[in-house]
């Protein structure tokens, strides 16, 4: 018997300026991408909680992430039409054409990814990192070739600067190509500038979607590192998924820990939830978040994280304002030069928390 997501337990949002709908929580296997059992158990739990979006990359374990995801989908007999699968292309080896965003690597790369995933197509293919050496026209045309060949339905970017994404949109307009629909970006309570400030015009002009990664700041927003670094923590192996979050945290530990303790108090006293659940709820409360990717080293962590969906429903203006004051890192809003004053941040305008403008300059 085939399996599919339990849609009664989840909210679904349109991914950018497209007709594709994704669960507000998705699953990514950048953590423990070589663990077959963890992958199988995690996907099963995700489906039970309504998750329909599953993300991987050719670079996760140099292909093993795609292998384990494909194997699990097959073993669980997941209905292909009921889920949204994405992978990302950039680097798979050390040979000259094994990396970057040339037409050769993009077309050959996705064909090899599909073999590992045991799929005929992916719903979304991402450019995993920017490549300023390859002409942007070549990359945009290659992504369109994938769509024309039926190997992917949509394409997106990951960790691209706003100017390069804007250039991609303009190239697609000029050449009458299908533009990207989303950006996979790092966003959480402590990393806000890119999503809330740098991408502001992309959201307004192109309705760009987002697939958020590292919503817990590499686990720091669970609060488990306040007292000490646990022996079984991935930070003991200096593994923060390339986000540099651990160094940032340790360099400013006293300041971060003070905020974490206050946020923990808000979570427990106001919402009867964990700090991690509050942090996840805060991310999906932003209307510019299309989906938030969860990853866990244990299934019980994933199970606890899904409870954040109920916390998200309880976030009101007063709690959101209290969180803003605690974080005190609100990216600056646009400047109204007629009155020479700063407007509220885009996030706070969208959430109608428009009377608070504290934070960074």
For the regions a protein language model found, what residue spans apply to each?
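Active-site groove signature of glycoside hydrolases
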Residues: 114-135
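Acidic-and-aromatic substrate-binding clefts and catalytic sites of carbohydrate-active enzymes
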Residues: 33-36, 57-66, 93, 131-135, ...
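Beta/alpha (TIM)-barrel catalytic core signal, keyed to glycine-rich beta->alpha loops juxtaposed to Asp/Glu
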Residues: 3-9, 132, 136-327, 346-361
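Short, acidic/polar
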Residues: 34-46, 100-117, 165-170
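N-terminal binding-site loop/beta-alpha segment at the start of enzyme catalytic domains
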Residues: 1-83, 148
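Active-site mouth loops of central-metabolism enzymes
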Residues: 28-37, 92-107, 128-134
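Short acidic capping loops at alpha-helix termini that bridge into adjacent secondary structure
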Residues: 24, 79-83, 87, 120-124, ...
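Conserved beta-strand positions
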Residues: 27, 56, 87, 124-127, ...
């Amino acid at each position: 018997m085939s399996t599919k997501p339990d849609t009664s337990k989840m909210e679904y949002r349109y991914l950018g300026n497209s007709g594709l709908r994704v669960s507000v929580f998705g699953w990514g296997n950048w953590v423990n991408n070589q663990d077959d059992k963890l992958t199988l158990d995690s996907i099963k739990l995700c489906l039970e909680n309504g998750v329909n979006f599953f993300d991987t990359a050719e670079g996760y374990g140099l292909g093993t992430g795609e292998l384990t995801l494909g194997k699990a989908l097959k073993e669980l007999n997941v209905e292909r039409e009921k889920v949204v699968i994405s992978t990302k292309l950039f680097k798979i080896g050390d040979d000259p054409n094994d990396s970057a965003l040339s037409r050769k690597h993009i077309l050959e790369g996705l064909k090899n990814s599909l073999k590992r995933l045991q799929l005929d197509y992916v719903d979304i293919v991402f450019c995993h990192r920017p490549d300023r050496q390859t002409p942007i026209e070549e990359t945009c045309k290659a992504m369109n070739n994938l769509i024309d060949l039926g190997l992917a339905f949509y394409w997106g970017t990951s960790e691209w600067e706003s100017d390069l994404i804007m250039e991609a949109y303009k190239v697609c307009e000029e050449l009458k190509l299908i533009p990207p629909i989303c950006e996979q970006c790092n966003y959480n309570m402590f990393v806000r500038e890119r999503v809330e400030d740098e991408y502001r015009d992309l959201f307004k002009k192109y309705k760009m979607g987002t697939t958020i990664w590292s919503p817990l700041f590499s686990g720091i927003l669970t609060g488990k590192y306040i007292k000490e670094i646990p022996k079984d923590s991935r930070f003991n192996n200096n593994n923060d998924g390339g986000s540099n979050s651990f160094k940032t945290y340790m360099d400013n530990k006293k300041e971060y820990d003070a905020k974490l303790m206050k946020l923990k108090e808000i979570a427990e006293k106001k919402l009867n939830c964990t700090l991690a659940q509050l942090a996840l709820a805060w991310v999906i409360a932003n209307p510019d978040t299309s989906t938030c990717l969860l990853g866990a080293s244990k299934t019980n962590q994933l199970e606890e994280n899904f409870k954040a969906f109920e916390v998200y429903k309880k976030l009101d203006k007063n709690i959101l304002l209290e969180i803003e004051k605690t974080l005190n890192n609100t990216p600056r809003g646009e400047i109204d030069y007629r009155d020479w004053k700063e407007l509220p941040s885009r996030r706070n305008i969208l959430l109608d928390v428009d009377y608070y403008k504290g934070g960074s300059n």
